Each structure stands twice: as C-alpha cells, then as structure tokens.
Amino acid sequence: MNYPYIPHTDEDVRAMLDFIGVSSIEELFSSIPVSARSSLNIPESRDEFSVFKQLKEISEMNNSLEDYAVFLGAGVYKRYVPTVVYDLAMKPDFLTAYTPYQAEVSQGTLQALFEYQTMVCELTGMEVANASMYDGATALAEAALMSFRLTGKEKVVVARSVHPEYRAVLRTYLEKRGFTVVEAGYDETGRVLLEEVDEETAAIAVQYPNFFGIIEDLDYVRSRSGNALLIVVVEPVSLALLEPPGSYGADIVVGEGQSLGLPMWFGGYSLGIFATREEYVRQMPGRLIGQTVDQAGNTAYTMILQTREQHIRRARATSNICSNHAHAALIAAVYMSVMGPDGLKEVARRSYNAAHYLQERLEEIGFKLCFSGEFFNEFVFNVPEDYPDRWRKMMEKKILGPLPLEEFYPELGDTALACATEVISKEDIEKLLEAMK
C-alpha cells in the first residue's frame, strides 16, 4: 500500500526482505529484546477535513494581536498593512529570499530590489543603499565594522539611548575580535552626551528617534564627532516627517525595516536597512542591485560591485552574508510604493499625534514624562512600583501595555516606555488609562 511521503511500496519491502534473506520485518528485528521495544504511538491516518478542523482548534489557543490594544513598541510596531501589499509580494514569482544570481531569470525581483534601494536613499537622504541586511541590530554591527575598515581605528562610541538589544549584538560582533565598544550616557532631555569621543574613535552611533522615543539633535552629534564617522540608527516611518540623517552629514544610516509592511514577530523574519555615501560603497556590506542596459538596448537590472562580497577571498570581503532577507526588502518596496510619500507622511503624522494625545491623557491622571526632549511616537514616563504586575494583568484585558524599563536600564526603575502608532484609537487609549488607574 502507498502512503504519502513514504517511498517504499509493499513490493519494495518484499524485495528488500528477500534480498537480505528474512521472511518478515518482525524477523528482521527479532534480535531486539521485547523489553527494549516500544510503540511509536502514531495515530491512524485522517482525512483533510478532520485534520484542518483539529489544526484550527489548536490555532484558536493562540492570542491574536488583532484583538489587542498594543502600546508596546521598542523596535517592533503594530501597523496597518494594505492587503494589496501581500497580494503582490506573495506572488510565486517573488516568493524566495534567495539571492538573484541569475539576472536573466530574475528581472522582476531585481527591479523591485533596485526600487527598494532607491526609496531607502530617498528616506534617509543617503546616496547608496544595499538590498537588505538581516535586521536592524546586525546592520548596526556591520556599520561599525565598516567604520573600522574606512578609518583604520578600532573604537566605536555608541549611545546608551540606542536600543539595548542592538548594543548587545554590537558587543557580540566586536569585542571578541579585539575592538572597543564605549557607551555614551544621556541627559535629562533623553538625548546623548558625547564626552567619550576622542581621536581614536572610528565612529559614533546614535539612534534617531532613540530608544526612549526622543528625537536626537543630530547637529549637536555631528559637531561633537570630530573625525569620527557618524552612524545613525533610524525608524524608517519617522523619516517621512523628520529631516533625513543625510542632511545632517551622516556617514552610514541603518535601521530596522519591520515598520515598512512586515508583521510583528518574536525573533524572526526581519529587515535590516543599510545606506551610506557613494564614496564608501566599496566597503559597504550586503548585496547591491544596479540598473544597466542589455545587448538589445533594454533597461536591465543586475547585482553589481560584487568584488566587495564573498566572491573574492574571504578575508578581503566586506561581509559574508548569504541568503539574506531579500523577500522582506521586496515587501518593504511594495509597501512604500503603495503608500507613496503622502501616505507615509500620514502614517507618521497619525503615529505622532496618537502618542502625544496618549501622553497628555496619562499626564492628566498623574503619570509624568521622564525626559524633557521632543519625542516622536514613543515616550518614557514614571510609573508606580507595582507597575510590572499591573503590566502582566493588562494582558488579561487584551492590552499590551507600555514596556517596563528597569530590566534594560536599572537607573530607570519605575518607568515605562509607551508607544502609539496609526492603528491606536481614542477608545484604545481610554482602555489603557482605565487599566493604569
């Protein structure tokens, strides 16, 4: 009898038993003591309808974010993604994260990635962008390594107001290789202090807006950087309203692209943004897609400047990224194309307004801001000592509340990081306020 995924028919089994000279499978395994045998406990086969029903019952044990008011940000955000984005991005023609080495059969994917790079450059104000990195944290680490190659120095100063998990990844990448990571503090506004920068500093890394939601003063940061390169970690949607880092003289811009049409996740499927100046392109990691003309004179797209990559000697390559998250970049390209400049500005504006309304309502019931600097769509505020317990109980009311910060910043005990995006309604905010009382 044939079974799906089991290649051996009854005739195959009989032929194998005859070949080795035994009459049955039981005889084949007769040398194994009965006491050592156990049943596989495999259930009887089931039809598709009953399997689907069982899987649906199991899936209903999960909680859906669609049912929650989400005030939890800190690098991953609940946003609305138009249905057309996945209708296009999930077409079988596109559905691979593999590198499009064969340009002649990958023109659609290559064009989409080229357009992604172009839109990232427009958002960041930079001259060249690659076709994606793994995520925001590893993009920052690669930016630091790039700064070492460009300057010949081995020290990076990173603001403590950069996402704590990004800083952890940075240390993992750098310290075992002998590089130095120094953290710079922050002031009462929530903005970075740069007292640690010296002539041995290869680069300064700041976040804009930073982990606390505060909009960093990049003019100040640039003025304090001296000869060090300026690395700016961005939240891409915010750049629809804020001045791009390139206009402040940033040398490398990196970030997490999850806000650009990707779902919320817990440790998976992500997108690293990476952009820089054209003069540094030979030291930029990752894939780069270029536009050219084929033999017939038609516009064509292909991977370019591959001598930076692992096609050359490993020791000379700028990075050794393999099958990267190209499909995530494609989704981001579709999302940005669908939204357009005005749509992205509207998403950013609604997020900004929702966060500021939330902050005002929290202040009305006694919750004060922790920092005085201007914020985008996240902010830190003071909370009572028992807030972590309240935070967990909020989940029972379908609320993912603001994030308690003491675990990440011991000096910020009894504070929380609140986030609001374009999907947060006044009703959601009132629901949170009631749970906070």
UniProtKB/Swiss-Prot annotation:
Catalytic activity: N(6)-[(R)-lipoyl]-L-lysyl-[glycine-cleavage complex H protein] + glycine + H(+) = N(6)-[(R)-S(8)-aminomethyldihydrolipoyl]-L-lysyl-[glycine-cleavage complex H protein] + CO2
Superkingdom of the source species: Bacteria
GO molecular function terms listed in the Swiss-Prot or TrEMBL record: glycine dehydrogenase (decarboxylating) activity
Alphabetized Pfam families for the sequence: GDC-P (PF02347)
Keyword Glycosyltransferase: no
UniProt EC number: 1.4.4.2
InterPro entries in UniProt: GcvPA (IPR023010), GDC-P_N (IPR049315), GDC_P (IPR020581), PyrdxlP-dep_Trfase (IPR015424), PyrdxlP-dep_Trfase_major (IPR015421), PyrdxlP-dep_Trfase_small (IPR015422)
Keyword Oxidoreductase: yes
One Gene Ontology term from the biological process aspect of the record: glycine decarboxylation via glycine cleavage system
Keywords: Oxidoreductase
NCBIfam families in the record: PRK00451.1
Family statement drawn from the similarity comment of this UniProt entry: Belongs to the GcvP family. N-terminal subunit subfamily.
HAMAP family xref list: GcvPA
Assembly description: The glycine cleavage system is composed of four proteins: P, T, L and H. In this organism, the P 'protein' is a heterodimer of two subunits.
Function: The glycine cleavage system catalyzes the degradation of glycine. The P protein binds the alpha-amino group of glycine through its pyridoxal phosphate cofactor; CO(2) is released and the remaining methylamine moiety is then transferred to the lipoamide cofactor of the H protein.
Protein name: Probable glycine dehydrogenase (decarboxylating) subunit 1
Organism of derivation: Thermotoga maritima (strain ATCC 43589 / DSM 3109 / JCM 10099 / NBRC 100826 / MSB8)
